Every structure is written in structure tokens, then in C-alpha cells.
């Protein structure tokens, strides 16, 4: 496939990962992408670079560069400007596209977050290149082409997409799809600085104020340590409260399988599976979920999977670590009661032991 690449793109090399900052901290998906980017770079025999964009002198950008090297980057690109203090599409797009045009990476990876999706789309459009969104697997073929795999047709098929005649090859990956690599104390590589050639007057959007999202009801399932989810086996929408009660008792979050979203019982941000959230909690409790392959793909990275289902032949028992053949509607309240008693202060030390 590479042999058909136009001549002007044949000198593109190296793998880049955009390091996303969230409230001054590196977003976990960027660390996951550094681990995946390291594998791709090693297969191609090229360098892995972290790309950091932010305000000058900020502790966040310094930490981002340190994390990039600790998780596998050989070098980092840094764009600093007061215009980059907060995310706005125009200056971030300008910074990243100018970097790409000047340094010619072969592969550019971003997290499929709200920010990453917005930035990736505008950068790909500006550069007139291809973008494969929400990938679940990344690899390189024998000729070095990026093979970006993502679910399609509602998760019933996996499609591998190639960017044949454009560069860079761009892809976004959802949080928790890739494993988090080990942090390693490595020598600091080169830091290449680049100026943002833009004026405030050229930017249409202005940041006026920030409002705390501490009361937000939006799910953050991708990074929850404990997740309790329900499926059609719950029978009625009012039984979702059983999930919420158990999740609250365990200090976790709650979600559901795709059919409950289709019924309108829960919003899409609570959907778990190949076409929803991919999760890697320490404990995953699935109540009344049959365990179709699309759901399995989204949860199989969990440390411990506990399945509750009335059907002993349900597919979920094939990959659950612990299985309970029971009616989830009656079993969940009993389980919540047991954990509530066990987690009382006087019993907590004994429970942990």
C-alpha cells in the first residue's frame, strides 16, 4: 500500500501522540496512547514523539513532557503561547497543523475525548488527510501502513481502515481501550520548541468563564474502579435503582448494556460495550446482561467480572470470573445489604483482611 503513496508524502516518518491536558493533568488516554504508539514506532523502526500544547511556564506542560518521556517517547514537541492557556479549536488546530507541516509525522494519534475528537477532526480537515475515529485496535502492516480497526454497523462488524494516499495517518482511540503502560525512569530526550504564529484577533472564540462540573451526572465509566451494570434482565426501568444503590455502596459507578439505551432507560454515556464505553475496573458486576460479543469486548479488561443471570447458558458465564444463577432483581438488594454491613467502620478492617 505504501508503494502507491504520492512522492511528496514518502518522507513522512515517526509516530506522534498528542498529550491532552485536563485541568493541568495529563489525561489517562494520552498515557495509554503512548504505550500503543511505542509499539507502532518499534515495528516501524522510527521515533515516538509526544506533542504538548499549552501556556508558557505552566506546570502542566512540564509534567506532560516528563510523562511523555516516562511512558516511552523519544522526543517531545512543545508549543507554548498565552493563547493556548485554555482549549480553543482555532489556536490548537493552528499549533498542531503547523507542527505537522514542519516535521512530517507518519502517524498522529489522539484520544477520542471531547477535546480530542474536536481537534482531530479540524486538523485532519485542514491537512486534507484521513482520520479513523474511535479505534479499538492499531497495527502496522508489513509495508508499514497503519491498520486502524474500529466497530461499524452498530458494533456487529469490525472494519480495518487505511489512509492510502495522504499523510499523516490519523486515528483517535477511546479511553481505556488500550492498556496503561508501565512508567519507566528513562533519560530525557530532545524537546523541540515551536512558536504559535497567531494573534488573539484571529481567534473567533473567547473563554469568558468556567463552571465546575462537580455536580455533573455525566458518567466517567472508563476510569471507575468499580462498575455495576444492568441489562434486559432487570425487567423494568424502576429496577435501575438497584444498580445505583449497589454502585453507591461500593463507591463505584453504574452503566448498562446497549438494549437499555435503545429503550431510553439510560443515556448513551452509560452504555458499556464495543459501541459505548470500554472499561477496565477492578470489579465489574453485570446484572441481567446476556453477554453478547459486543458487550464482552467492552469489559474483558476488567480484573474481576461477576455475572448475575437467570439463564445458566448465558454467554456472559463463558468469560465471567464468578457466576451467579439468580434473579438479579432479588439478588441485587441482598448483595447491597451484605456489602453495606461489611463496609461499616467496625467491620471494614476485617473485610479488607
UniProtKB/Swiss-Prot annotation:
A biological process term (GO) from this entry: fatty acid beta-oxidation using acyl-CoA dehydrogenase
Pfam families: ETF, ETF_alpha
Disulphide connectivity of cysteines: none
Keywords from the UniProt entry: Electron transport, FAD, Flavoprotein, Nitrogen fixation, Plasmid, Transport
Amino-acid positions noted as binding FAD in the UniProt annotation, renumbered to this chain: 283-311
UniProt xrefs under CDD domains: ETF_alpha (cd01715)
Xref: Gene3D superfamilies: HUPs, TPP-binding domain
GO molecular function: electron transfer activity; flavin adenine dinucleotide binding
Protein family membership: Belongs to the ETF alpha-subunit/FixB family.
Record's function text: May play a role in a redox process involved in nitrogen fixation.
Subunit structure: FixA and FixB form a heterodimer.
Protein name per the record: Protein FixB
Organism of this sequence: Rhizobium meliloti (strain 1021)
